[in-house]
A protein has these predicted regions:
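Non-catalytic, mostly N-terminal accessory regions of nucleic-acid modification and defense proteins
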Residues: 1-192, 257-266, 383-386, 410-419, ...
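A conserved structural/catalytic subdomain of Rossmann-like adenosyl-cofactor enzymes
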Residues: 2-4, 263, 270-517
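Soluble or luminal CAZymes and related metallo-dependent hydrolases
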Residues: 8, 12, 234, 332
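Glycine- and acidic
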Residues: 18, 141, 165-169, 196, ...
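Conserved, well-folded catalytic cores of nucleic-acid-processing
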Residues: 19, 139, 158, 162, ...
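A generic secondary-structure signal for well-formed alpha-helical elements
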Residues: 40-53, 163, 214, 250, ...
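Conserved S-adenosyl-L-methionine
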Residues: 170-281, 285-305, 334-335, 354-357, ...
Length: 517
């Protein structure tokens, strides 16, 4: 039998989503499809591992199946795909029980499988689930049946992108367009041996792309990439998707925690924030009510109207992350940035995607921006094109922070206007490879490029009240067209001559018709 290739795998997996269409919201497809995909993969690979143990260790098949030492994930009998696939009644409950059993035997999967529930028979009747099981039964996902084991991770990335496209604005909650991720990773340049952290990791794309970048640049240790991947995600379903994403990409030592990064960061060592070599993120744009502790007990005035919480007095962070200022309640952008800055090592580099407003808004945000510039943390600002993201059409920017800037960039900021570097689409624009390469080369070259890049001294930024609006530093106006007056006069004369000819012919026709004498 021919081995499963990437094209067939992608189409097969995406067709499974079409079975669900009309029964559940498209934004929830990923939770169910990835759960079943992982169950099928884990079960198929479980039996392949048993066969390998029989061949290499000389044990009998029953022992190879039952001994946990022979398996990456131990799959109990009630979770074997063969057992699930033959169910005709109460299929959803059987799947939920299988997921619970897998978690009992595999502590690293705690909460991952049970993040989604199949037991709602009104939403997922047996007839529908039976079709899904039959569909997934078509191919084996064991390594020996794949053209290359890597295609499983590639197909997972493909599905995430398809689900994001299908979900519209909701897609932006768990997925950043791959081209934006590639640009960001190439700007911060993770290296072999680095620890990499994403505080709002979504489905894990930025972490995985960082690891791929390291691998492409010789950072392999045997079959594994020489790096440490860590992240945190607030949404339970998206966290589970990210955990499975790490598994299918073979990043077995990744550490993805669930929870609110701002209110309760999870990567703590001896009571202190863990620090990292590279920090990368695309946090939710302009998140309001970002400090949940201040939103729990909203006071009311004498008329019974809610009193807006005073974040300046209510935000109290035990880790001292907001020492440059408390961002306003309506805009959490610089709260995420300061969190990332706090977990960045002294020789580390970070990149964050934020809306343009953080570059010029005043009040507390202006004071935070001034402090970041005065401390010489900001290395570069890159303005991106509009309509790149699923959940907003507004243009965004990339901010690169480097705690150990090279001497030639001390008290200077690279500002790049890449807003015109895109391929236009019907609903969404994309960065093309040439645009990414142009931006990265400009950043690395550290030379002014007319209408595209400037290295701006801090003194000039100070004169502009620490406003980083890109248009203040790079002339983005189009060149005025030089008009040849003589050509214009000649064209007007030609038009007037043709007008006379038309009038003459019109009069001739009117005479024939008897309207004029």
């Amino acid at each position: 039998m021919a081995k499963l290739n990437l094209e067939t795998l992608e189409k097969w997996l995406w067709d499974s989503a079409n079975i669900l269409r009309g029964h559940i919201d498209s934004s929830d497809f990923k939770n169910y499809i990835f759960g079943l995909m992982f169950l099928k993969r884990a079960s198929d690979q479980f039996f392949e591992e048993a066969k390998i143990a029989v061949e290499k260790e000389g044990v009998d098949l029953e022992e190879a199946i039952e001994d946990e030492d022979y398996h990456r994930f131990f799959i109990p009998k009630n979770a074997w795909w063969s057992e699930i696939a033959k169910k005709t009644e109460n299929i959803g409950q059987a799947i939920d029980q299988a997921f619970s059993s897998i978690e009992e035997y595999n502590s690293s999967l705690e909460g991952v499988m049970t993040a989604v529930h199949f037991g709602d028979s009104e939403k997922l009747p047996d007839s529908l689930l039976s079709r899904l099981l039959q569909h997934f039964n078509k191919y084996s996902l064991a390594n020996s049946d794949l053209e290359n084991p890597d295609i499983l991770g590639n197909s997972y990335e493909y599905l995430i992108r398809q689900f994001a496209d299908d979900s519209g604005k909701k897609g932006g909650e768990f997925y950043t367009p791959k081209e934006v991720v590639q640009l960001l990773v190439q700007l911060i340049k993770p290296e072999a041996g680095n620890s990499i952290y994403d505080p709002t990791c979504g489905s894990g794309g930025m972490l995985i792309e960082s690891a791929h970048y390291i691998a492409k640049n010789g950072g392999m240790l045997g079959e594994y990439v020489d790096c440490t991947l860590k992240g945190q995600e607030k949404n339970l379903g998206t966290w589970a998707v990210c955990k499975i994403n790490m598994i299918v990409h073979n990043f077995k030592d990744s550490d993805i925690r669930k929870g609110d990064t701002l209110g309760s960061p999870k990567h703590i060592i001896n009571g202190e924030l863990e620090t990292f070599d590279r920090v990368i993120a695309n946090p939710p744009f302009s998140l309001s009510n970002w400090w949940e502790a201040a939103e729990v007990d909203i006071k009311t005035d004498v008329k019974g109207k809610p009193v807006t919480p005073d974040y300046k007095s209510l935000v109290s962070d035990e880790y001292g992350r907001f020492k440059y200022g408390i961002p306003p309640r309506s805009y959490g952008d610089l709260a995420f940035l300061q969190h990332m800055l706090s977990v960045l090592k002294q020789n580390g580099k970070m990149g964050i995607v934020l809306p343009h407003g953080v570059l010029f808004r005043g009040s507390s945000e202006g004071k935070i921006r001034e402090a970041l510039l005065q401390n010489d943390f900001i290395e570069a600002i890159i303005g991106l094109p509009e309509k790149l993201f699923y959940n907003t059409g507004i243009p965004a920017s990339i901010i690169i922070i480097n705690k150990s800037k090279p001497q030639e960039l001390k008290n200077k900021v690279i500002i790049i206007d890449a807003s015109k570097e895109y391929k236009e689409g019907k609903n969404q624009n994309t960065l093309n490879p040439e645009s990414i390469e142009k931006t990265v080369k400009a950043y690395e070259g550290m030379q002014d490029i007319e209408k595209f890049m400037r290295i701006v001294p801090l003194e000039e930024i100070k004169e502009n009240d620490y406003n980083l609006n890109i248009a203040r530093y790079i002339d983005t106006s189009s060149e005025e067209e030089i008009i040849n007056i003589e050509n214009v006069i000649n064209k007007i004369a030609d038009i007037e001559e043709k007008e006379k000819e038309i009038d003459t012919k019109l009069n001739e026709y009117l005479k024939i018709l008897g309207f004029v004498s």
